[in-house]
Regions:
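Non-catalytic structural scaffold of enzyme domains
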Residues: 1-260
Length: 260
């Protein structure tokens, strides 16, 4: 297999990174993709930094052995804890991380109120705090830890009374004092954009960083001459550490999901 035809590999603690994969496929449909969900060890967001680093290294090793030409860490928590380590271990492979779309939100709403929904671990991580500090003088940035929200996505529960009750409770203070933008700081959360919109109404813009990740991947592949030059769409293969038919079926369903 030629280098250009080798897959771009994604990994996440479960299924949430499929939201990043979907955006990447829209930008680079000709590429081949391999998605690895580590649902056996989910969620990463409540684990220690050392645990997340060990799990991330194991996932990356699996993907490299499968022939990955680039790795996308499709998880904000793993990016915060392990991206530097992964780049040290694999200096010859582009390793792309994800981070909340805080910069574009602040640029669009200078002096505004920006709510960042993320896992408790992401909110606590030094990487996020440094990013927040970078823009503190340009906008009011509010971190909202959402423990348990990702599990709704992992169950495929993207709408309905339970998830909307959870979101209503979390977002109630920001309905009384509205925000200008809501940054989805976890790659699970784009699947819940419709549910969030139904609660907050048409006012705040909902933003995530998936498109920025896809564009960065395109730049890295172009720089290294590894863009696949083919007029036909590529393939998308799904793997999961649980190796259960149900979770692989859910992975494919999320890949095709459209919310209104």
């Amino acid at each position: 297999m030629q280098k250009q035809d080798q897959p771009v590999a994604f990994f996440d603690s479960g299924l949430r990174g499929i939201s990043v994969l979907r955006e990447t496929v829209r930008l680079l449909p000709q590429e081949n993709y391999l998605y690895y969900g580590d649902s056996l060890h989910a969620p990463y967001g409540v684990k220690s930094e050392a645990q997340i680093q060990a799990l991330s290294l194991a996932a990356a090793e699996h993907l490299v052995s499968a022939g990955a030409k680039a790795i996308v860490v499709a998880c904000n928590t793993a990016t915060s804890a392990a991206i530097g380590l992964l780049r040290q271990v694999y200096p010859d492979i582009p390793v792309i991380g994800t981070e909340p779309a805080l910069k574009p939100a602040v640029e669009k709403y200078p002096g505004g109120r920006i709510l960042v929904m993320a896992t408790p671990m992401t909110i606590k991580q030094e990487k996020f705090q440094a990013l927040k500090h970078q823009f503190d003088d340009r906008a009011q940035i509010i971190g909202l830890p959402c423990e348990g929200l990702m599990e709704f996505v992992e169950r495929g529960e993207l709408r309905g009374s339970a998830v909307e009750a959870y979101l209503t409770e979390k977002l109630a203070p920001y309905l009384r004092e509205p925000v200008d933008g809501i940054v989805l700081g976890c790659t699970h959360y784009p699947f819940l954009t419709g549910a969030i919109r139904r609660i907050v109404g048409p006012g705040p813009e909902i933003m995530d960083g998936s498109h920025g990740v896809a564009m960065q991947l395109e730049r890295k592949l172009a720089q290294s001459g590894m863009l696949r030059q083919c007029g036909e769409p590529g393939t998308a293969v799904f793997e999961n550490s649980l190796d259960e038919p149900e979770i692989l079926a859910l992975s494919r369903a999320l890949f095709r999901y459209r919310d209104e």
